[in-house]
Swiss-Prot record:
Any Pfam family: Enolase_C
Source organism per UniProt: Moorella thermoacetica (strain ATCC 39073 / JCM 9320)
Keyword flag Calcium: no
Name of the encoding gene: eno
A GO molecular-function descriptor: phosphopyruvate hydratase activity
Source organism superkingdom: Bacteria
Name of the protein in question: Enolase
GO cellular component terms, A-Z: cell surface; extracellular region; phosphopyruvate hydratase complex
Protein family (similarity comment): Belongs to the enolase family.
Free-text remark on how the cofactor is bound: Binds a second Mg(2+) ion via substrate during catalysis.
CC cofactor: Mg(2+)
Function: Catalyzes the reversible conversion of 2-phosphoglycerate (2-PG) into phosphoenolpyruvate (PEP). It is essential for the degradation of carbohydrates via glycolysis.
Pathway: Carbohydrate degradation; glycolysis; pyruvate from D-glyceraldehyde 3-phosphate: step 4/5
Length: 428
């Protein structure tokens, strides 16, 4: 019934107008699954490799026909006849077929597309929603959204160094109310920016990218927007930051070009500590560079008890790097991006390892997204409690939020919105 009868891949476009891979898996029973693969702008050096054609005559070298061909000509013939319910075995075969440590031969974009489409086809064959198929009867926790509504760094052309300023409506009573709070703050922020004569065009992830004077001014503007929307900062709505510090790291120092300041690793720890003392900041992602392990230890000792310290470039959804971080006491949370590691199985293993160590897991989109909503189902399946999927603006972001609204409605009384309990490893 769940035997794979065909696998087909094609090249489609992502939200930035760049090509990406879409895969369809067909089962003998009529079950069917489709998955599209996202792509990042600021990528960690240790991420699994996205295969691009490098043909300058097509899409500026960013075509993915090689990855598509690897699926149709190499992967499909191997997997046709396999049982779609055997996800771990299929993912093992995909990893083995590639044979490289970073999935650089077939391409992580090829492998992930197949891995996710297989899971969706299996769920379809069983007549189950994807979150229920992946998570079983205990999948019931809706996530606190981490909404990137103000952009700097690589996601914007402005003089703000910190890449993302986010709001987290952790004081809401349910997911629908949290989404409403985030959307109202987003619209309030637009009005605040307009009143200051600032640009309200949106960036890659749906957030605004005005030319603010400093990183601190960005935080102040966000607090004003929260208050003007009728919410209390630090009670209803909290702030999360993603400085993407690896992008600022030059020759062992952190260069804040927009502010004209260079900081050492120790000075970075002090900088974050001063902001946490002054503002209702609940989460900092990539507060230090991906290779500054000692700095991460210091940051975690200093702030790990009172703020979520998320490793993104630091861990790249990789269990080997996460294991090192756990041993060293570096960070207290991991960002989970399915395309950083390249299979569903490895993604679920990273989440499990994090939870066992008392780390929180934040399931995340990429800046180059599609209408695919798989991550919304994954975050509920594993009861992660947090999702990062952009502003409540641009359809490729909103698609994930709308899927979560549907899931909350379907779960009905069984649905749990954790609020501040999503940050279970912080001392309140």
């Amino acid at each position: 019934m769940t035997t794979i009868s065909d696998i087909y891949a094609r090249e489609i476009l992502d939200s930035r107008g760049n090509p990406t891979v879409e895969v369809e898996v067909f089962l003998e029973s009529g079950g069917w699954g489709r998955a599209a693969v996202p792509s990042g702008a600021s990528t960690g050096a240790y991420e699994a490799v996205e295969l691009r054609d490098k043909d300058p005559k097509r899409y500026g070298g960013k075509g993915v026909l090689d990855a598509v061909n690897n699926i149709n000509a190499i992967i499909a013939p191997e997997l046709v006849g396999s049982d779609a319910l055997d996800q771990r075995e299929i993912d093992r075969q995909l990893i083995e077929m590639d044979g490289t440590p970073n999935k650089g031969k077939l391409g992580a974009n090829a492998i992930l597309g197949v891995s996710l489409a297989v899971a969706k086809a299996a769920a379809d064959a069983l007549g189950l929603p994807l979150y229920r198929y992946l998570g079983g009867v205990n999948a019931h926790t809706l996530p606190v959204p981490m909404m990137n509504i103000l952009n700097g760094g690589k996601h914007a052309d402005n003089n703000v160094d910190i890449q993302e300023f986010m709001v987290m409506p952790a004081g809401a009573s349910d997911f629908a109310s949290a989404l409403r709070m985030g959307a109202e703050v987003f619209h309030s922020l637009k009005a605040v920016l307009q009143s200051k004569g600032l640009n309200t065009a949106v960036g890659d992830e749906g957030g605004f990218a005005p030319n603010l004077r400093s990183n601190v001014e960005a935080i102040e503007v966000l607090l004003e927007a929260i208050a003007k929307a009728g919410y209390e900062p630090g009670k209803d709505c909290f702030i999360a930051l993603d400085p993407a510090s690896t992008e600022l790291y030059k020759d062992g120092k952190y260069v804040f070009a927009g502010e004209g300041v260079t900081r050492t690793s120790d000075e970075m720890v002090e900088f974050w500590a001063s902001l946490v003392d002054k503002y209702p900041i609940i989460s900092i992602e990539d507060g230090l560079a991906e290779d500054d392990w000692e700095g991460w230890q210091n940051l975690t000792k200093r702030l790990g008890h009172k703020v979520q310290l998320v490793g993104d470039d630091l861990f790249v959804t990789n269990t080997e790097r996460l294991s090192r971080g756990i041993e060293m006491g570096a960070a207290n949370a991991i960002l989970i991006k399915v395309n950083q590691i390249g299979t569903l199985t490895e993604t679920l293993e990273a989440i499990e390892m994090a939870k066992k160590a008392g780390y929180t897991a934040v399931v995340s989109h990429r800046s180059g997204e599609t209408e695919d909503t798989t991550i919304a189902d994954i975050v509920v399946a594993v009861n992660a409690g947090q999702i990062k999927t952009g502003a409540p603006s641009r359809t490729e972001r909103v698609a994930k939020y709308n899927q979560l609204l549907r899931i909350e409605e379907e779960l009905d009384a069984a649905a749990l919105y954790p609020g501040l309990k999503a940050f279970y490893n912080l001392k309140k």
